[in-house]
Structures are given as structure tokens and as C-alpha cells.
Design a protein with these regions (language model features):
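Catalytic cores of carbohydrate-active enzymes
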Residues: 153, 391-392, 494-610, 651, ...
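C-terminal beta-strand-rich structural cap/linker in extracellular carbohydrate-active enzymes
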Residues: 772-788
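Carbohydrate-binding/catalytic loop surfaces
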Residues: 343-351, 392-410, 438-440, 444, ...
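Anionic coordination/interaction segments
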Residues: 1-357, 371, 376-380, 420-424, ...
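Surface beta-strand/loop "capping" patches
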Residues: 714-745
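Aromatic-rich carbohydrate-recognition surfaces in CAZymes
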Residues: 263, 353, 357-358, 362-464, ...
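Active-site acid/base region of carbohydrate-active enzymes
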Residues: 314-329, 368, 377-389, 413, ...
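Short strand-turn-strand beta-turns centered on an Asx-Gly dipeptide
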Residues: 761-765
């Protein structure tokens, strides 16, 4: 039943966790554990994969994305009762012996398991602390004295996933696992020829804070023949084979013997990396310090509290509050670090860093970590050419050639990112920093973003709209410009917004240049004269001159982006803007978000030679609920002061709410973070979500919530507060850290008019200005809604 989600999971808001009551979810429900250099993704059932900096070239262990059993690889802990011989796992998998009592939980940067079986209790905390190591910290106890063995194992593979798939027959001769008696640790070394960065490839260690009694480095020695992780031969024998490995199938395994009482015993297992020329001993000494794991776990758990100091909200809608304070910030943080490289849906092999993806991820991170955001923008600018275009994907860690594919939108996102920095810090210093051009030379940040605008202006089509080039944000439109003539309405709207931001920057720095005004005027005229179609803006113009998104077309007659971005860019008059969004919402709202387009594209549309779709009707980009695009619709509704409509769309898209509508099994993906897309009502398996975690939805949903629904928007001159909360809320409280001051903002909506501001009070005194900026460490703001 759709309402029976509590059999699967529930939220513990006092702990800021999601609790899982069973291990066998319809798909692995992941979490990310990281210190920014060492990463692990881990599921509710303990399946996991770790990597150091890059999952493409420094992967630690195997993870079989498409094989059965699903989620069948990870760092596994086995509990064996020496008397009875029974074996089980606190994660349930891989032995699948169901504990008498069990749950797992994901929090911000950690995952934990609680399991009780046959009188033995295990509490396991999984996290990555300050050092580059995954820590499995266990407290184990028993009702009566018990003798047990704990086996910990992690199958290793070649660090380069694609090389392993293609050349493992030869390359697996170039690895080893050796045991060191002095440090009681296993070390893995990968030294295959022609690695991308061989001098920086780390060694991997496996150890614990307790002396082992046996170990293995050979998979065959630990597993035996024709067995899997459910029944390794070493567990039957009661000991590992004490094997080393010099070429072959690698695996870390260690055995620890414990005598249990009702007083918990601690065992911490470590899987981490260290430098090629370094000794592992100093790192192990640190990890093995008394109470080290306990202290590090507390520090990791405190990360969310530190993040909440920058932004948090207290509102009547607790599902929305949870997303605002915990899981949306978590997802946005992971996207900033990982981009779109690796998840349960992405194998981490060829994606690298995407220009448009990373530039949008920055937008939500500026609030939390301005220096890291500036550094990321400079990295992205280094992929721009002197002409203004950018590489599409690039590989700063892997050091291989970028994907040059010329997309019409990539470079414009850089303008928004640089503008965001200026608005957050209130300084223009960043504009004067320099970044190289990919094809030689260097320029200031300002010069780079000017070239971004210039490149679009230099590539206009027959009708004066920007050429689609390889595609715009919507990859499905790649065939629109196959012959070099197709044009993008969406990019025209992006250009208008970029020029408005550039114009504001010019005003701030005192640069007298009317170029942005001229571009805005030309593009707005074309958008209104040529692209307006009764009650909507068309989406694109094909090579043949077909207006894609024309209301009379049998497919794709309405696209959400060219309506929402008309509002976001402010490219037309209020009447048209209201009309196009009214058309979009009334046509596209399916009850769990807005469809990306309607009707879905069909095969051979508009012709066999120029077919647009690569997905089934109602699936993914072809008329599914594409969550990223919905964030812009929410922003547009707020800009039009349609507060209740904005709230409705936001609520519909909360994953937990969709689960309550369709049920856990049908929704399939995690109910605590956003997926990229959800199947539309007309599709088979309607309501099924796909491609979770890594999505631009994370960044833009935070912006939609913080800056538009709550209305707390950073501007160069200060905070501009224009809430657009639902009329039904009586009040809301937002905390926002801005330029050294912690603002507590009370939104008083007693009047039930959540889209307008009647009065503003700063520290108890009436404030009539437009921008709020305090030099004190704290400030209180009270916004009274209502008509003036």
C-alpha cells in the first residue's frame, strides 16, 4: 500500500536521520561518506564502494552495478559464534541471515547499523573522518558470555574500472596484497603500466584497532571455489588462510576473536589510503588511539550542525523543513564534491566534471563555502577557450583530454556562478582574479564571463536566436542543430539573464558599456515577436525552420523550460509571463510535479532523419517529471508572486510525498533525496524514479527554497527579503548567515498573505530600506506580510 511506508522507513527528525526497518529495499538507497578526498557510497544494506579522489582511476574495491545480487559488494562484517558455528552480518547481507532485531540509518556523512541476533548485539557506525580512511566502528556485546570470531573482508579489484573490464587478464598481474606483521595490516599496491598518474596512485591499507588472528590477501584463499560472499570457505574453517597475493584476484580479510559479555567491546576496522613512499605506521598509530573512532564520529555528526549555522528554517510543514535543513543540503554538498561522476546509476568511468553541472552545483555551495566555490569556478574557467566556448566534460584528476563537444549553454552558467559570488560576499575582488584559457593565455574572471556572453552573440542563427550547436541544457535536442542552423529559445532567455547580471556588475564596478543593454533589447524583441505563440513561448527552431513547441504540433507542443525561463529572465511583459506559466502549470502538472514537455515526443518526430527523442514517451527527458526543470518553475511562480502554486509544486516533488502517493516499491528510489526524473502518468511504471542523488535538482531546489519561497536573497547591496510562503502558514523562521552576521528572520503571516511584505523590522525598529545589511554578529528581522 502507498501509505505503508513505515514498514520500510521513517524519519527521526530529532536525530536528523532516516531509519530503515528492512534491508531489502527495491533498490540500494545510498548515502555518501567523505572528507572531500576519500569517498564511500554505502547503502542501507551495507553494500558499498570507496575511492580516493577519482572513482575512475583510484577505485578501492569492486562494485557490480548491474549484476545480481543487487548491492552485492562492500566492506562486509561477519559474526561467527564459535560454539554453534552460526554466521550472520549486522548489515544482513551478504549472508542474509535475518537478525532478531535490526535497523540501519543514514545521517549527514555517516551510516549506522543496529543488529541483535541470538543474544549478540552489534552497533556499527560507518563514516570517513579527518584521515583518508573508511571507519567501521563497532560496539559488540552479549547477554551471556560468548566466544565469537569477527571476520572483516573487502574484495579488491584493479583501481581503474575500465581497464579491469577490458584487460584484467593481463593487468591483474600488476597488483599485490602483503601482510605486515609489525603493523598487523594488509597493504594493497596497484602498479599496472600506463596509469594516468602512476606517481600519485596511493597504496590501500586494511587494519583494525585490535590484533588480528588470521588474514588473507588472496580472494581464492578466503572464498574457496564456486562460492560467494554468503559462504566463504574461511568462515567454515574458522580461520583465514594467512595468504599474501602477488598478482591475481585480490581481497582484504582479517579475523578477530572476542570474548563477549554484557559490557560492549569495541572493534574498529579501517580501509584507507596512504602515499607510495610513506609508511602506514604513523597513520595506523593515530587511527588506533584510544577513543579515536568515537571522537571522529562525534565530529562527523557535528558537520550538519555547522552547516545549519549558515541556513536553517523552522516551518509548519515538517516534510519540507526536513528537506530544507538536512537532506537537500546533504545532496547539494555531495553534488558539489562528486558532480555527476558516480552513484548507483552512474558507474564513475567517463563522466569527469561536467561544465554545466559543476557551474550549477556552485550556486548552492557559495553560501556554505565561498573559498571552495571560488576555487571551483576558477577551475571551470580554465576549461574556457579564448573564443568563449568551453569544454563539456573535463578530467582534472585523471589528466586526460576533455570532451570538447560545443554546447550552447555551458559557458553561460559561468556568468551566473561569478555573479553569485559577488552577491554573497559584497566585494568585486573575485572579478579581478585570473584563470587560464584552455587554448593559451589567461584572463580575469570578468573577461572570462564577458567572453561567455560574446560567444553566444557570435553564434546566432537566421532568426537572431542563439544557435543550438551540439545541444543546450536539454541533451535530447542535439538533432535540432544537426546541420548548423537550429536555434534555442531557452539559450536566448539564458543570454538575457546573463546580460542583466553583467549589466549589474558593470554598474557596481563603474564600467560604462551599453553592450548588455543592446543584447537584451535585441533578444527580447525576437522572443516576443517571433517566439511567442498565443499562450506560450516555443522551445527551439529546427534546421528546417520548424518551431518546436508550437501549440499546433502533435508532439512537444509545450515545454516547461521556455516558460519558466521567460519569467526568470524577465524577457517579456507581465501579461505574457503570467499567461505562459498559467499554460504550463495547467497543462503539465500531473500531481507529482510538472511534466518536462507535452505531448511526449514520438519516434520519427519531426522526421526520421532528425528524430529528437531517445526515450520512451513519459520517461526521463521525454515528457517525464524532470525534477531539475521543476525547480525553475517554482522560482518562476515565486517571481510572479504565485505563492500557493509554488508551494504546491514544491510539496508535490518532495520524494517522501511521492512515496506516500505511489508506495515504496513503485517509486523505487530513495525517499529522502531528489531523483533526476520520475515516470509520467502515461508511461509504464508511472511514478517510478530514476537516477537519484546526482542531479542539478539539488542545487536549484535549495535556491528555490531559500531565495524564492523563503525569499531571503543575497544581493550585492545586502539581503533582499521578499517571502513567497503559502497563505496557510501563520509564521516561519529562517536563520541565514550573511557577511559575518547571523540573521534570525521571522516571517509573520498572520494576515494570510504570504506573497507580499507590509512591514519590516530590523532589531525591533521599523526598516524601510530595500536591502538589509548589519555589521553586528547577530541581527533579528521581522517581516510582516500583507498589503501596504
Amino acid at each position: 500500500m502507498a501509505t505503508d511506508f513505515k514498514r520500510y522507513y521513517e524519519f527521526k527528525d530529532d536525530l536528523d536521520e532516516v531509519i530503515f526497518h528492512r534491508h531489502d529495499m527495491p533498490s540500494p538507497w545510498m548515502n555518501y561518506l567523505t572528507n572531500g578526498t576519500f569517498f564511500t557510497m554505502i547503502s542501507q544494506a551495507g553494500g558499498s564502494l570507496s575511492w580516493y579522489r577519482s572513482p575512475e582511476i583510484w577505485r578501492i574495491g569492486r562494485y557490480n552495478f548491474y549484476n545480481l545480487p543487487t548491492d552485492g559488494n562492500g566492506l562486509f562484517i561477519y559474526i561467527k559464534d564459535k560454539k554453534t558455528g552460526k554466521v550472520w552480518n549486522p548489515t544482513v547481507i551478504p549472508c542474509n541471515a535475518i537478525p532478531d532485531e535490526w535497523y540501519s540509518a543514514h545521517g549527514f556523512g555517516y551510516t549506522r547499523f543496529h543488529a541483535v541476533k541470538d543474544g549478540v548485539t552489534v552497533d556499527l557506525n560507518c563514516f570517513v573522518g579527518t584521515e583518508n580512511a573508511l571507519i567501521y566502528d563497532m560496539n559488540i556485546s552479549a547477554e551471556t558470555q560468548r566466544e565469537i570470531s569477527v571476520f572483516a573482508c573487502r574484495e579488491m579489484g584493479l583501481m581503474e574500472y575500465l581497464r579491469e573490464v577490458q584487460w584484467q587478464c593481463y593487468c591483474k598481474a600488476s597488483n599485490n596484497i602483503l601482510y605486515d606483521e609489525k603493523t598487523d595490516s594488509l597493504s594493497y599496491e596497484y602498479f599496472v603500466d600506463a596509469q594516468p598518474r602512476p606517481d600519485e596512485t596511493p597504496k590501500v591499507f586494511f587494519a583494525a584497532n585490535m590484533r588480528s588472528v588470521s588474514h588473507d590477501g588472496s580472494r581464492k584463499s578466503f572464498m574457496g571455489s564456486y562460492r560467494d560472499f554468503e559462504n566463504p570457505i574461511s568462515l567454515e574453517r574458522g580461520a583465514c588462510g594467512n595468504s599474501d597475493l602477488k598478482g591475481g584476484e585480490a581481497l582484504f580479510a582479517m579475523q578477530f576473536d572476542l570474548t563477549l559479555t554484557n559490557k560492549p567491546q569495541n572493534l574498529s576496522v579501517f580501509l584507507g589510503t596512504y602515499g607510495q613512499t610513506e609508511s602506514v605506521k604513523p597513520l595506523l598509530d593515530k587511527l588506533r588511539e584510544k577513543n579515536y573512532a568515537e571522537k571522529e564520529f562525534k565530529r562527523v555528526k557535528n558537520r550538519l550542525s555547522e552547516r545549519k549555522k549558515y541556513f536553517s528554517a523552522e516551518i509548519p510543514d515538517k516534510d519540507m523543513q526536513r528537506m530544507a535543513n538536512v537532506f537537500n543540503p546533504l545532496q547539494a554538498y555531495v553534488n558539489f564534491l562528486v558532480c555527476r561522476e558516480i552513484s548507483f546509476y552512474a558507474t564513475g568511468t567517463v563522466r569527469g566534471i561536467g561544465m554545466r553541472d559543476a557551474a550549477q552545483d556552485v550556486l548552492a555551495n557559495v553560501l556554505y563555502d565561498l573559498p571552495a566555490s571560488e576555487e571551483k569556478i576558477l577551475l571551470l574557467l580554465g576549461q574556457q577557450y579564448n573564443c568563449g566556448k568551453t569544454n563539456h566534460y573535463f578530467y582534472p584528476v585523471e589528466k586526460r583530454e576533455p570532451l570538447v563537444s560545443d554546447r550552447s549553454d555551458n559557458h553561460l552558467w559561468l556568468v551566473y556562478a561569478a555573479y553569485k559570488v559577488i552577491c554573497e560576499c559584497g566585494k568585486t575582488d573575485f572579478l579581478n582574479k585570473t584563470a587560464p584559457y584552455f587554448d593559451g593565455g589567461e584572463g580575469t574572471v570578468l573577461e572570462h564571463i564577458e567572453k561567455s556572453v560574446g560567444y553566444t552573440v557570435d553564434h546566432l542563427g537566421e532568426h537572431g536566436l542563439p544557435l543550438m550547436l551540439g545541444s543546450d541544457w536539454n541533451d535530447m535536442l542535439s538533432n535540432v542543430c544537426k546541420e548548423g542552423k537550429g536555434e534555442s529559445v531557452f539559450v536566448s532567455q539564458m543570454l538575457v539573464l546573463a546580460c542583466k547580471q553583467l549589466k549589474e556588475i558593470y554598474a557596481i564596478i563603474g564600467k560604462d558599456d551599453k553592450t548588455p543593454d543592446e543584447i537584451i533589447a535585441r533578444q527580447e524583441k525576437i522572443l516576443n515577436d517571433f517566439c511567442w505563440n498565443e499562450d506560450r513561448f516555443i522551445r527551439a527552431v529546427s534546421d528546417e525552420g520548424l518551431k518546436i513547441g508550437n501549440r499546433d504540433e502533435k508532439c512537444g507542443a509545450l515545454w516547461i523550460n521556455s516558460q519558466s525561463w521567460a519569467v526568470i529572465s524577465g524577457c517579456s511583459d507581465e501579461e505574457k509571463l503570467r499567461k505562459c506559466m498559467e499554460t504550463a502549470v495547467s497543462t503539465l502538472d500531473c500531481g507529482y510535479g510538472l511534466l518536462k514537455l507535452y505531448p511526449p515526443l514520438q519516434r520519427n518526430y519531426p522526421s526520421k532523419e532528425h528524430e529528437l527523442t531517445f526515450a520512451q514517451p513519459g520517461v526521463n527527458e521525454n515528457g517525464g517529471v524532470f525534477c531539475h526543470a521543476n525547480t525553475w518553475a517554482i522560482i518562476a511562480e515565486c517571481m510572479l508572486k504565485n505563492n500557493n502554486e509554488a508551494y504546491k509544486i514544491y510539496k508535490e516533488l518532495i520524494p517522501h510525498n511521492i512515496v506516500k502517493k505511489f508506495g515504496v516499491e513503485k517509486y523505487n528510489a530513495e525517499p529522502y533525496i531528489y531523483s533526476s526524473n520520475i515516470r509520467a502518468p502515461m508511461a509504464l511504471d508511472a511514478g517510478q524514479a530514476g537516477v537519484s542523488w546526482l542531479s542539478g535538482t539539488a542545487s536549484w531546489m535549495m535556491i528555490a527554497l531559500e531565495e524564492y519561497i523563503f525569499g531571503v536573497k543575497p544581493c550585492y547591496k545586502g539581503l533582499k527579503i521578499q517571502p513567497c510562503i503559502p497563505d496557510e502558514w501563520e509564521k516561519a523562521t529562517v536563520k541565514r548567515f550573511f557577511r559575518g552576521c547571523e540573521y534570525t528572520i521571522e516571517l509573520d503571516n498572520s494576515a494570510g498573505c504570504g506573497n507580499s511584505v507590509k512591514e519590516v523590522y530590523l532589531n525591533g525598529r521599523r526598516f524601510d530600506g530595500e536591502y538589509i545589511l548589519s555589521s553586528a554578529p547577530t541581527a533579528s528581522v521581522r517581516i510582516v506580510t500583507g498589503k501596504k
